[in-house]
């Protein structure tokens, strides 16, 4: 028996093309993306949580939506519906493409040597790449929804669509490029 996400979209046909992210973008078949926080106590267990639920959890991190899982659930469901209506594609595939396009590969870290701090470029772990990507997408969507007539779901759908096309108008793509540019300058 095959389950569809929100009883609408089949996740078995979704593919992750970025080889580094394949083990960290979970596409398990579930109807309701809500694990009740079972993954919290184990170190890398969040990579086994559905990518859609992780997007919901990132939406809940903003001040206005803190802890409001039902609100985040409806925002994500509506956003996926909008994406499906606009593109006629599986919206989970569009989300995965957006995550791949906005996941930075390099960032800087501070090294202190001899009392002097240096910025050096380091590769980012795949788990952190997915986290940063989802964070960029949700932050961009929530910022554009603030004091705007558009709903949060519409703004999230727009951000995901722009990010999946690697459009430079996307907040997430801009943040990724900024992070990688800073890392390149630290070489």
UniProtKB/Swiss-Prot annotation:
RNA-binding in keyword set: yes
State the Gene Ontology terms under molecular function: rRNA binding; structural constituent of ribosome
Q: Which Pfam families match?
A: Ribosomal_S7 (PF00177)
User: What InterPro entries does its record include?
Assistant: Ribosomal_uS7, Ribosomal_uS7_arc, Ribosomal_uS7_CS, Ribosomal_uS7_dom, Ribosomal_uS7_dom_sf, Ribosomal_uS7_euk/arc
Q: Output the Gene Ontology cellular-component terms.
A: small ribosomal subunit
A GO biological-process term: translation
How does the record describe its quaternary structure? Part of the 30S ribosomal subunit.
Role, per record: One of the primary rRNA binding proteins, it binds directly to 16S rRNA where it nucleates assembly of the head domain of the 30S subunit. Is located at the subunit interface close to the decoding center.
Family, per the entry? Belongs to the universal ribosomal protein uS7 family.
Q: What is this protein called?
A: Small ribosomal subunit protein uS7
Q: Which organism is it from?
A: Methanosphaera stadtmanae (strain ATCC 43021 / DSM 3091 / JCM 11832 / MCB-3)
């Amino acid at each position: 028996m095959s389950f569809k996400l929100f009883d609408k979209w089949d996740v078995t046909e979704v593919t992750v093309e970025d080889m580094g992210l394949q083990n960290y973008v979970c596409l398990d078949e579930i109807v309701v993306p809500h694990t009740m926080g079972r993954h919290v106590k184990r170190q890398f267990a969040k990579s086994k949580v559905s990518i859609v639920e992780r997007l919901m959890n990132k939406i809940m991190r903003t001040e206005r939506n803190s802890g409001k899982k039902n609100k985040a659930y409806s925002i994500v469901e509506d956003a996926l519906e909008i994406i499906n209506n606009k593109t006629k594609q599986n919206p989970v595939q569009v989300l995965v493409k957006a995550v791949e396009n906005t996941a930075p590969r390099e960032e800087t870290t501070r090294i202190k040597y001899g009392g002097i701090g240096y910025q050096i470029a380091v590769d980012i772990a795949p788990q952190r790449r997915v986290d940063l990507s989802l964070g960029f997408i949700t932050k961009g969507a929530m910022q554009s929804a603030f004091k705007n007539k558009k709903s949060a779901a519409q703004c999230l759908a727009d951000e995901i669509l722009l990010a999946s096309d690697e459009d430079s108008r996307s907040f997430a793509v801009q943040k990724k490029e900024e992070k990688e540019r800073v890392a390149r300058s630290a070489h």
